[in-house]
Structures are given as structure tokens and as C-alpha cells.
Amino acid sequence: MRRARKDVVITSPYLIPGPLGITAFEALGQRNVKTVVLTNSLAATDEPLVHTGYSRYRRQLLESGVDLYEISPERTRRTKRLGMFGSSFGRLHAKTAVVDGHTVFVGSMNLDPRSDTQNTELGIFVDSPALAKELLRIVNISKLQSAYRLRLDSHGNLEWLSMDEDNETIFTDEPETSFWLRLHNMLISPFLPEQLL
């Protein structure tokens, strides 16, 4: 990511950037590198506790200029467009990055502390504009048809937006989740050590 000059597009099912990751995203923003991240929403993840680690950083990611998208199980089921990029449950599984429209990373590594320090992960970088173009096409379809776009409102609160045809729907709570799941994650979050998520 440090070598990016114009754009970076990342998919990661589990995203916990930590302070160093936030610094890297902020540096991209300061260099006017367009950064897009697609990850799982709370409704889509199979690890709600890991999602608490990610949710700590959403505001900072948005403030640093990241275009942030979260996969929606309901929107995915309706469009049936995630295909090999995810699962039939409307969950992101791909771990990819495209830098400047030609360098592609595909691997098993999430952007989280476990992948960095505890798990054995691997990945490959390929310089292929054709592969990058196809991967970007799939990501663009996914983010437009199968994901919520996140933003901050005028008071700095999170909003999730979905576009269906000509209609924009705005959610102020994590979409497709119950009050109880959100409460559980909010209460347990302060006690979860980030390096174990």
C-alpha cells in the first residue's frame, strides 16, 4: 500500500487495522490515493466478536478518506451477484487487494492481528492489469449491489446507505442485526483484547 500512487482496493472478511493500519490508511489519504475497502457487516460476519475489533476503527477509516463498504446478506441474496467472491450466505470470504490498477494480491491473510502474528498465512502478488481489471469489476458489482456504503453524518455518526434502483435507504444502526446482538457486542467490546481477535 505504501507504493500506491492513485488507488487501492481491498477486500478482507475480517478487518482490524489497529493503530499502524490506521496510520497507513491516513498516509494514503494524505497522498490523495483513493482507497476502497470492502468487508463483512455485523450481519454478514461469522465472527461477531471479531467485528467488535473492526467497529472500533470505522470512524477513523472514514475520516482518513477510505470509501468503506460492508457486505449485506439480504442484498446479496436479492441480487445473487457475489458468486465465487463470497458464500451463499452473503458473506465475504475473499482476501484481495488491487493497487494502481495493475498489482494484485490474493491470499489467505486478513487485515487483522491474528493473521499478522498468530496464523500461518500466504499470499501472492501478481503484476497483471487484466487480472486487476476483472477483480475490480467484481468488487464494483459487489459494493454497488451487495453492500452498504458507510459514511459519517453531519454530527459524526455512522450511517449505512443502500441504493436500490433510484431509492437510497439510510440506516443509523447496523442493518440486518438485532438490538440484542448490537448490545452484546457493545457491552463485551471493551473487554476483548485486540491482538486475540
Q: Predicted regions span which residues?
A:
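Secondary-structure "cap/kink" motif recognition
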Residues: 1-7, 193
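Short catalytic-loop micro-motif centered on adjacent basic/acidic residues
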Residues: 9-12
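PLD/PLD-like phosphodiesterase catalytic module centered on the HKD motif
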Residues: 15-197
